[in-house]
């Protein structure tokens, strides 16, 4: 099996569609209550689905790996994206930056290199 899609809750589908399109994702399904996007690299997809406002305590984090994290963050900041965490080296050997979509879902852009699948503590 291969993980292909994750669906996030969205209390404002229109704003969320605009947000993810501005990040560069390709919109492949667009309905009033649902939208699906394709990654620019590979065939993975993710979607948003209309719901009541997302609880502030949501633990959902959507991760997107970037070959050059700092350049990607600067490009998104140049079009007005606000990050809650600037690129930072983490103790688990990933470099991460975070922002929040219009529905409160946390988006983590990161670069992990070989450590994504092969951290030193891998079982």
Short names for language-model regions:
Residues 7, 41-43, 52, 103, ...:
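Short, flexible active-site-adjacent loop segments at beta-strand->alpha-helix junctions, enriched
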Residues 7-45:
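Core segments of cupin and vicinal oxygen chelate
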Residues 2-11, 53-123:
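Vicinal oxygen chelate
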Residues 31-34, 56, 90-95:
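Short acidic/glycine-enriched loop/turn segments that link adjacent beta-strands
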Residues 29-31, 49-53, 89, 111-115:
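Acetyl-CoA-dependent GNAT
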